[in-house]
A protein has these predicted regions:
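Alpha-helical segment of the N-proximal tetratricopeptide repeat
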Residues: 1-25, 35, 117
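Tandem amphipathic alpha-helical repeat scaffolds
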Residues: 5-9, 34-44, 70-86, 110-125, ...
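Single-residue signature of alpha-solenoid repeat helices
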Residues: 16, 49, 89-90, 128, ...
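Amphipathic alpha-helical segments of tetratricopeptide repeats
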Residues: 17, 24-25, 54-65, 78, ...
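Residue signature of alpha-solenoid helical repeat architecture, marking inter-repeat boundaries
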Residues: 27, 34, 63, 67, ...
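Residues within the DNA-recognition helix of helix-turn-helix
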Residues: 52, 442, 517-520
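Generic long, charged, amphipathic alpha-helical segments
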Residues: 360-426, 469-480
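Helix-turn-helix DNA-binding segment
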Residues: 415, 464-467, 473-544
Length: 544
């Protein structure tokens, strides 16, 4: 048993599985069932894991190990609710866990885990926060860092959702620091903390924070096999926002495969994000196929509205966004409004302007400005400045240039290249009459950004604007300049003779991601193999 537990703690699920299966072949016990269940969970075999936790529960009850039975019951509750979405089953198993712990009459760390699950079920934000703070206190009292930092990470997410963004992100940072320092015993706890962190960063478009922690935690994530399907989906969303679309596609497709293998009913998380990527790329038919059947999914609202707008179906986008952002245009922002509604309002401004409803666009832009002021994050600040600038351009009055400059600065700070390029395009429109040379420069910069991102539809719009300004538009192969920043890094490492695994170690990316980048580099540069890539890099260095 000790060998199996040690294997679990170092993340070696296959070794642990062999140990516990061997133990169960000799005698069935709660400890062996629970150990095998944890190994199955780490291998993403969620249905089998839940089944073996149930068996562990029954065995512990027979053995009259009350605290262990309560632990098994709350874990079944966790898996059935969070993985399979079976809320009634989750409630039943959680009630069983609470009853057993009450029956045992002991003060133990298990009460902390139960409080965490209760927080997931609690709709009221204040009550949820209270449960989590109590769980943190229990973890500290018993010296159980898994409880303490899991609850701390989740509390950070709750604070972000209630617009206490900076306070919440500091808590998630602390939980990640503990995970990276090796303070946590359970691989599943580390997994969940990373998933919560990626979800939080995606929610507020905090690309720099996600990027820093990915570098800091690269070794841990590889060693302990941390990135599960939900993590990959959220990380793919962050990579999409960061303009690293090739990497995003790899993560999202891998996430879909993970979901298909372990929990196909929850694959909407990756499908919605992949659909968002396709809209940005201008691959609208593929996006529509990915969103088929997800019309009522709350996470699909923004992507679906963006798809409608891109297809010229502004009325459908308007109806959807108005329903999902219903509220006062004049009142004080409600709790959680900036985090959840802000991005939808930014898109609604585009929809109203497309319909030439400038008055409605201005009302929404003003509402967006109020909630951006409440959150004070760079993304919403930039989105509000862009919306105000767009309204100024549409009205032909106001200081559009100043607003758009502010948006450019904030989008650059947030490391959001797609939004940065769109703002440059708006700047070109704003200055077309008064400063045509500056407008041409802005449009050219936008076109280059869109081409680098491979955002075909937006690149066409930028090219058309340049032509209308009387500027020549370059066509044909772009050579080395068409490579993304990451592809250029990969090319340089190929050029010095590194293998794919060596490149992956150097850049903290997976071997599959390296293969994807190498294939793109060869295709873009018209090269047939790595030897030609080495020769290409050598020629480039010689010509400088």
């Amino acid at each position: 048993m000790d060998d199996g537990v040690a294997a679990l703690r170092r993340g070696d699920a296959s070794a642990a599985r062999r140990v516990f299966e061997s133990a169960l072949a000799e005698v069935e016990s709660g400890e062996a069932f629970e150990g095998l269940a944890e190994a199955l969970y780490l291998e993403r075999e969620y249905a089998a894991a839940a089944d073996h936790y149930e068996r562990a529960y029954a065995a512990y009850r027979r053995e009259r190990q009350h605290m262990a039975a309560g632990r098994a019951a709350r874990t079944v509750s966790w898996i059935t609710g969070n993985v399979f979405g079976d809320w009634a089953v989750r409630i039943g198993w959680l009630a069983r866990a609470r009853a057993i712990l009450t029956e045992a009459g002991e003060d133990s760390p298990e009460h902390g885990w139960v409080l965490i699950i209760r927080a997931f079920l609690e709709p009221d934000a204040q009550a949820r926060e209270a449960f989590l703070r109590e769980a943190i206190a229990i973890g500290r009292r018993f010296g159980d860092p898994d409880i303490e930092f899991y609850a701390l990470s989740y509390l950070g997410g709750v604070l972000v959702m209630t617009d206490r963004v900076e306070e919440g992100l500091v808590l998630t940072d602390e939980a990640l620091a503990a995970a990276c320092a090796g303070e946590l015993a359970e691989v599943a706890t580390v997994d969940s903390i990373f998933c919560g962190f990626f979800w939080t960063c995606e929610l507020v478009n905090d690309v720099p924070r996600a990027d820093q922690w990915m570098r800091a935690a690269a070794e841990l994530m590889q060693r302990r096999n941390v990135v599960a399907a939900f993590c990959r989906a959220h990380y793919g969303g962050i990579l999409t926002a960061a303009g690293r679309w090739d990497e995003a596609e790899v993560q999202l497709l891998e996430s879909t495969r993970h979901f298909d293998r372990g929990m196909p009913e929850r694959r909407a998380a990756s499908l919605i994000r992949l659909a968002d990527l396709r809209v940005r790329q201008g691959r609208l038919e593929e996006s529509a196929m990915l969103l088929d059947g997800l019309d009522d999914h709350p996470d699909a609202v923004r992507t679906l509205a963006a798809l409608y707008l891109a297809r010229g179906e502004a009325a459908l986008a308007q109806d959807l966004l108005e329903r999902c952002t219903a509220g006062s245009d004049d009142g004080v922002p409600t709790v959680g409004e900036s985090t959840m509604v802000g991005p939808l309002l930014a898109l609604l401004v585009d929809v109203y302007l497309e319909a030439d409803n400038v008055d409605a666009a201005e009302r929404i832009a003003q509402r967006l400005a109020r909630i951006a002021e409440a959150q004070r994050g760079p993304y919403l600040k930039a989105a509000a400045a862009l919306a105000k600038g767009q309204v100024c351009v549409a009205r032909g009055q106001g200081d559009a240039r100043s607003c758009l400059h502010s948006a450019l600065e904030s989008f650059a700070l947030a490391q959001l290249p797609m939004e940065l390029a769109q703002t440059r395009l708006e700047m070109a429109r704003a200055l077309a009459a008064s400063s045509p040379q500056v407008a041409i420069a802005a449009a050219k910069a936008a076109l280059e950004d869109f081409e680098r991102l491979k955002a075909a539809r937006h690149a066409d719009v930028a090219a058309a604007l340049l032509r209308s300004l009387g500027a020549p538009v370059r066509t044909g192969p772009k050579g080395h300049g068409a490579l993304t920043k990451r592809e250029t890094e990969v090319l340089q490492l190929v050029g010095v003779g590194l293998s794919n695994p060596e490149i992956g170690d150097r850049l903290f990316i997976t071997r599959k991601t390296v293969e994807h980048h190498v294939g793109n580099v060869l295709a873009k540069l018209g090269l047939r193999n790595r030897a030609e890539a080495v020769a290409y890099v050598t020629r480039e260095k010689t010509s400088r």
